[in-house]
Amino acid sequence: MTKYIFVTGGVVSSIGKGITAASLGRLLKNRGLSVTIQKFDPYINVDPGTMSPYQHGEVYVTDDGAETDLDLGHYERFIDINLNKYSNVTTGKVYSEVIKKERRGDYLGGTVQVIPHITNELKDRVFRAARMTNSDIIITEIGGTVGDIESLPFLEAIRQIKGDVGAENVLYIHTTLIPYIKAAGEMKTKPTQHSVKELRSLGIQPNIIVVRTEQPVSQEMKDKIALFCDIKASEVIESRDEETLYNVPLSLQKQKMDDIVLEHLQLEAPQAEMTDWKNLVHRVKNLSKKVRIGLVGKYVSLQDAYLSVAEALRHAGYDHDAEIEIDWIDSEKVTKENVAEIMKDVDGILVPGGFGDRAIEGKIAAIEYARVNKVPYFGICLGMQLATVEFARNVLGLEGAHSAEIEPETNHNIIDLLPEQKNIENMGGTLRLGLYPARIKQGTKAEAAYGTTLVEERHRHRYEFNNEYREQMEEAGMIVSATSPDGRLVEVVELIDHPWFVACQYHPEFISRPNRPQSLFKDFVGAALKNK
């Protein structure tokens, strides 16, 4: 019988529900249990694919091509599992499905309502994930904050699941904030009490309360929360700000959170073997070297827009015993005139993915600087496309060379629409998405990084390198080092006469893990260290 854990949040959003859920998943997996995890987002968008990064942070892509919430990246990195489209559910998806069923006549002429039709669809998404994975435990994080009107159908659905599968098979975890009032020198539990009161008014009694705090939570305070929220003091779990996120599972284990969960769910499992994880955390806290990477993007004011890229850099750093210092460089402020001054202290330059024409020339200036000055360069998606544009302009001498995405009327469309994209009108869900194979050319930097000639990586793009320019590029020193297996689509380019200049069309950051860094990131950081 599958067991169900639901993680809700109160007081404020962005208090670490995703990290809590992912950390618990790691502990349970290390106890020998099979775990899957999903995120319910109450917004009406079908997915975050067309949302601004300023609104949502990065869009995380799964193997099967789902454009999902960035929390799925935390889940995959912590638990080391590959999720799918059933792991991210939005109000938009649910309502779309219910309306489709109504139009098809599935409801036999009945009045379609939030209860039971929307709530049943939500429950089905939980049960479907359980059926598909046959997991011992499924963890479901409910986005937003208790009290939000958008969350009500989700909370009602998870309330009903307890009745559907039995109380012994369901556990509710509520994550709240205990604010520290500096002027008074006190921490306040009242917001937590009110948040739990709101949750209980909806029919959900939390079994565990995780309190986010900057200061230590005293036993007296835990007793007070337990009294007012009708749980044991041992079921109040402190979640402090950590030096590294990867210490959170160890902190939860120290407070026996996994034991409490298994006791509630009437499960028996051996203690979690966390030696490898402890070694990872020890390594992270005791890195002996430093390397500075200039990350050049247009969304750098919200670093969550590049969350997986930053994490993949850090993972590579762990492998090299190096702390990664990321210099967040706004490409809108980079020009040919000031690029040397901006880049003077960086050991490597990375241009990540992106869309649209804003701040493109700043990225191209950064790429030219890396190429000319032999600074290690790593381009991802748009970062690859602009590397070929820069090379076409400044090495091949093709005046006005550009991407058709940015300049549709260019005489030299180095980057053009994929043929299958030319008649597509809708933006959402229509990119080339998900895991695709790439064949790597022998004797290249890409092959040296991967140690193999066939890899699979996750993609998210609509435009592709124009093969009309391939021969000309290669003759001038920018070679195609990986393509799709049929040789049609360019996947990786690199410079022959450069210490490390590699750019890929796919998004390698999505498969990086803290204890298993992605190969190109690992090689790039190694090259940056040599450049110090």
Curated annotation (Swiss-Prot):
CDD domains: CTPS_N, GATase1_CTP_Synthase. Pfam families: CTP_synth_N (PF06418), GATase (PF00117). It is an enzyme of class 6 (ligase). It comes from Listeria monocytogenes serovar 1/2a (strain ATCC BAA-679 / EGD-e). GO terms for cellular component: cytosol. ATP binds at S14, I15, G16, K17, G18, I19, D71. SUPFAM superfamilies: Class I glutamine amidotransferase-like, P-loop containing nucleoside triphosphate hydrolases. One of its GO terms (biological process) is pyrimidine nucleobase biosynthetic process. Keywords: ATP-binding, Glutamine amidotransferase, Ligase, Magnesium, Metal-binding, Nucleotide-binding, Pyrimidine biosynthesis. The active site is at C381, H507, E509. Homotetramer. This is CTP synthase. It comes from the Bacteria. Residues 292-532 form the Glutamine amidotransferase type-1 domain. One of its GO terms (molecular function) is ATP binding. Catalyzes the ATP-dependent amination of UTP to CTP with either L-glutamine or ammonia as the source of nitrogen. Regulates intracellular CTP levels through interactions with the four ribonucleotide triphosphates. Mg(2+) binds at D71, E141. PROSITE patterns: GATASE_TYPE_1. Belongs to the CTP synthase family. The keyword DNA-binding does not apply. L-glutamine binds at Y54, G354, L382, G383, M384, Q385, E405, R462. CTPSs have evolved a hybrid strategy for distinguishing between UTP and CTP. The overlapping regions of the product feedback inhibitory and substrate sites recognize a common feature in both compounds, the triphosphate moiety. To differentiate isosteric substrate and product pyrimidine rings, an additional pocket far from the expected kinase/ligase catalytic site, specifically recognizes the cytosine and ribose portions of the product inhibitor. UTP binds at S13, K188, T189, K190, P191, T192, Q193, K224. Pathway: Pyrimidine metabolism; CTP biosynthesis via de novo pathway; CTP from UDP: step 2/2.
